[in-house]
Curated annotation (Swiss-Prot):
This protein is one of the nuclear-coded polypeptide chains of cytochrome c oxidase, the terminal oxidase in mitochondrial electron transport. This protein may be one of the heme-binding subunits of the oxidase. A motif (Cx10C motif) lies at residues 46-57. Belongs to the cytochrome c oxidase subunit 6B (TC 3.D.4.8) family. InterPro entries: COX6B-like, CX6/COA6-like_sf, Cyt_c_oxidase_su6B. Residues 22-65 form the CHCH domain. Disulfide bonds join C25-C57, C35-C46. A motif (Cx9C motif) lies at residues 25-35. The gene is COX6B-2. Its main location: mitochondrion. This is Cytochrome c oxidase subunit 6b-2. It is found in: Mitochondrion. Specifically expressed in roots. It comes from Arabidopsis thaliana. GO terms for cellular component: mitochondrion; plastid; respiratory chain complex IV. SUPFAM superfamilies: Cytochrome c oxidase subunit h (SSF47694).
Amino acid sequence: MEDEIELKTAPADFRFPTTNQTRHCFTRYIEFHRCTTAKGEESNDCERFAKYYRALCPGEWVDKWNEQRESGTFPGPL
């Protein structure tokens, strides 16, 4: 008997009713980093936000945002 893998993505969010999920992606990225700032890098509470932004955001965007955060030029409110 094989183990079944259950695939999940970010749940629907009433703040983002349209099919364009760019803003949803950016918001989840910011929520994750705000959570880790408030609760620490190892907080399990923040892991859901990480799963959401990883499911919604293209990897290139995340890489760029991470570089911007490190250099202090990230445009969002963290």
